[in-house]
Amino acid sequence: MAMRRKRILKEKCCDFSIDIPVPIQNELIRKGGLKGLLSQIPDSAELLINSRLHQALADPIRLTVMNALLSQPLCVCVIKEVVKIADSKLSYHLNILKEQELISGEQQGNWIIYSITDRGRQVLKSTERSEKEMRGRVAS
């Protein structure tokens, strides 16, 4: 069974000549060409900030810490028991979460008590919603 090929236009699109499918070309033209498309993409500084946030979330240990802190503020000794890693590794992970303002630590006597920030709570809720939507689409 032969596959039908999509009709491709060989016309000037944007500021250069490339072969692209007609629907893609039409949508690109509607957006103002390549310049219009590029105007919708965040600048490199914003993309760098977003990538660092996603890197912070891309580790199961850090997600475990954040989810534990959703329940209540915790001291390092309890967090260490939850994630079962060495002090140096835990410190590394906590610092990444603090740098992204996902958690905060407050000195209380001899302890540092960690809490999830509003930003951290919002990010977790957002990823949870996204995850539920993905599971719903896969189940359909």
Question: Residues of each region from the PLM?
Answer:
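Short, hydrophobic-biased segments on the C-terminal half of alpha helices
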Residues: 66, 94-95
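Alpha-helical residues within the helix-turn-helix
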Residues: 81, 92, 98-99
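Amphipathic alpha-helical dimerization/coiled-coil segments
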Residues: 2-49, 118-140
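Short alpha-helical linear motifs
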Residues: 89-93, 131
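Beta-hairpin "wing" of winged helix-turn-helix
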Residues: 98-108, 115
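N-terminal helix-turn-helix DNA-binding core of bacterial DNA-binding proteins
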Residues: 42-89, 112-119
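Functionally engaged cysteine thiol sites
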Residues: 75-77, 100, 134-135
